């Protein structure tokens, strides 16, 4: 394998303008400073972070909090740290090589392996879109007292409208997604002031690993699937690839990677806190007396008498915002996956239309919407090792990465994280076939 000189080929989706690229170049060279300059580097991780607060997180976090209280907060924290590591590696890969992860897979793997990776990634993208689309539709249906199908149609129309911002340029899309992320964060900040939280118990559970039974393990695996997202790993490399055009040598690429790492830490720390807030809210509101709450609709109807109409409305607003924004980001990732792996690009409206079809089929077939959300997260968890292993492989090769190759410790930690995810998936499959895990009690 020979080292690739960054080509900075634009990925699918919006691109940065020449003006933004020039401002980035000046900032990287140290010719401009200040908070406005810092905001230039905010974008890729913000867009990727929306994948970590999508409706799938709502479903799994509600189940975790209502059934096990604060017990599984440590899983959320650990999954968020793993997500930070792999999003940082993905961004570094895009900056160092000027290529995104699907493109590198296509260039360096055999054709059968590329096709297999593409199929796995497309299945994961559809599972992702199922969760995102259904989440937004459920929120709209509950808030405005609509049939779920009408909520799905409304979600589709809003998503199509937001995707039009792609034509306005990369920064416009970043600002739109950033505003939606901020809305979700503010909603859960408000919930924390309403819910009666035992902060000491929550803090202790965050640093104390414990799995009470087999169902807890299943939910924990779902949390990992909802927090570390395959399409976000692929997408971030392409979003960072856009920024690579502003870095013309190794020194400037090194500075750009440093800025990128800071953004990843900030954006995903916010996403992690939102996820922990979801579990804390569910634990505080439902665990004592309402531990059977496992569905989004149940959570909404139970919140109203427990914490008031305002808390229930805030919950729905955050769910709608999450579903619509993550659906837009999922479509962007789907474009990148298809073009990167098999060099096929279809119009964004057609991509959006195709990925919506499974959601309509699931609901028309009578499948419970929240069950579909949780199952989609398990599918994502099973699909996740493919991009994780590919990312470790490429970012650990000096011939490809040059001076930006992973440090040996980074490579070990990333490999250990991937092994943990693989292990969780194997346990999940064993449970799915009706076998029990020795030493792990079955839930009552």
Swiss-Prot record:
Tagged with keyword Lipoprotein: no
Origin: domain of life: Bacteria
GO MF entries: cadmium ion transmembrane transporter activity; manganese ion transmembrane transporter activity; metal ion binding; symporter activity
Signal peptide boundaries: none
Keyword hit for Methyltransferase: no
Pfam families: Nramp
Transmembrane segments: 39-59, 69-89, 109-128, 146-166, 175-195, 215-235, 264-284, 304-324, 346-366, 372-392, 417-437
Membrane topology note: Multi-pass membrane protein
Record-level GO BP terms: iron ion transmembrane transport
Function: H(+)-stimulated, divalent metal cation uptake system.
Sequence similarity: Belongs to the NRAMP family.
Protein name: Divalent metal cation transporter MntH
Originating gene: mntH
């Amino acid at each position: 394998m020979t080292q690739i000189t960054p080509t900075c080929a634009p990925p699918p989706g919006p691109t940065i303008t020449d003006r933004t690229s020039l401002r980035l170049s000046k900032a990287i060279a140290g010719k401009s400073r200040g908070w406005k300059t810092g905001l230039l580097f905010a974008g890729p991780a913000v867009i990727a972070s929306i994948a970590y607060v999508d409706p799938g997180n709502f479903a799994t976090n509600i189940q975790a909090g209502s059934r096990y209280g604060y017990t599984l907060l440590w899983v959320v924290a650990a999954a968020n740290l793993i997500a930070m590591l792999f999003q940082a590696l993905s961004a570094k890969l895009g900056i160092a090589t000027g290529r995104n992860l699907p493109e590198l897979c296509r260039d360096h793997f055999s054709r059968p392996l590329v096709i297999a990776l593409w199929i796995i990634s497309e299945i994961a993208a559809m599972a992702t879109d199922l969760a995102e689309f259904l989440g937004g539709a459920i929120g709209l249906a509950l808030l405005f007292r609509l049939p779920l199908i009408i909520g799905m149609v409304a979600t589709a129309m809003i998503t199509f409208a937001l995707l039009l911002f792609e034509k306005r340029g990369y920064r416009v899309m970043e600002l739109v997604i950033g505003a939606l992320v901020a809305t979700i964060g503010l909603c859960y900040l408000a919930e924390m002031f309403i819910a009666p939280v035992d902060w000491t118990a929550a803090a202790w559970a965050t640093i104390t690993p414990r799995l009470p039974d087999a169902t807890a393990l299943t939910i924990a695996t779902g949390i990992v699937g909802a927090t570390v997202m395959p399409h976000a790993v692929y997408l971030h490399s392409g979003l960072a690839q856009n920024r690579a055009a502003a870095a013309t040598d190794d020194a400037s690429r090194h500075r750009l990677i440093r800025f990128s790492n800071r953004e990843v830490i900030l954006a995903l720390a916010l996403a992690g806190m939102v996820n922990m807030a979801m579990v804390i809210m569910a634990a505080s509101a439902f665990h004592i007396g309402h531990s059977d709450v496992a569905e989004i609709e149940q959570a909404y109807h139970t919140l109203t008498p427990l914490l008031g109409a305002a808390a229930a409305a805030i919950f729905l607003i955050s769910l709608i915002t999450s579903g619509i924004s993550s659906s837009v980001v999922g479509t962007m990732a789907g474009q990148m996956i298809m073009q990167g792996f098999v060099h096929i690009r279809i119009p964004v409206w057609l991509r959006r239309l195709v990925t919506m079809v499974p959601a309509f089929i699931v609901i028309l077939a009578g499948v419970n919407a929240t069950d579909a959300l949780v199952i989609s997260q398990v599918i994502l968890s099973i699909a996740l090792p493919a991009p994780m292993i590919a990312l470790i492989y490429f970012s650990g090769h000096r011939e490809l990465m040059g001076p930006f190759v992973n440090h040996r410790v980074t490579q070990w930690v990333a490999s250990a994280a991937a092994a943990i995810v693989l292990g969780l998936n194997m346990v999940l499959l064993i449970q799915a076939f009706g076998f029990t895990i020795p030493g792990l009690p079955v839930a009552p």
